[in-house]
Amino acid sequence: KTFVPAIAVDRIIVSGLEDPGPAYFISDGEAVTKFIDLAKDVYSFVTLKAEPKVNGTQMNVKVSGHAGTNEMPLQTDLRLTTWLVEDNITSKQQEGKDTYIQNGVLRAVLSKNAWGDALDISGYDFEKNYSVTIKPEWNVKNMRVVSFVNNYDMNVERRTIYNTTQAPCMDPTGIYEQPTTANNNILSVVNGKILMSKGWQLVNVYDIS
């Protein structure tokens, strides 16, 4: 069964829904909010940090973490999956506007394969190091490393993502303008909650003059 639009968060399985999961049909904005809140209530037993460093055309990435337990819930084959993605890629499309901005385009799988590297948390702390050559057509200023601890299993219902992290490949050089118009679909308010594609933080500004 194929359907769009659909949403999947941490590959969690929600009982009582028509769709088999881990992707579910989006009926309305309220359903999205409830689904995200449900995923947020799942406790994570592992922390994760990605540290990319660029030197010319070479990028080295260190991913480290700490597990609060030596085995994750329902673990069968624990993996650490690390990808290199690029945002703000302009491409053509068939209908609507002439161009479309693609975010999260997969540029490289830093792990041995797309399902990740075997991860041993019996010692609680762990670390993986990766290296990749930056291709000329990549814009490293728009790239980020995405890494997540997940379970792999032949059964799609047992591929839970336990925690994830991301880090820009290059440090930002300053504050940039974030579009907030409805057409850009970057910021949405559903039932009084702010939903943004790249996350958000509240900032208070005070005039102390």
Residue ranges of model-derived segments:
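C-terminal outer-membrane/trafficking sorting elements
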Residues: 176-209
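Short, conserved sequence motifs used for protein processing/export or organelle targeting and
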Residues: 1-173
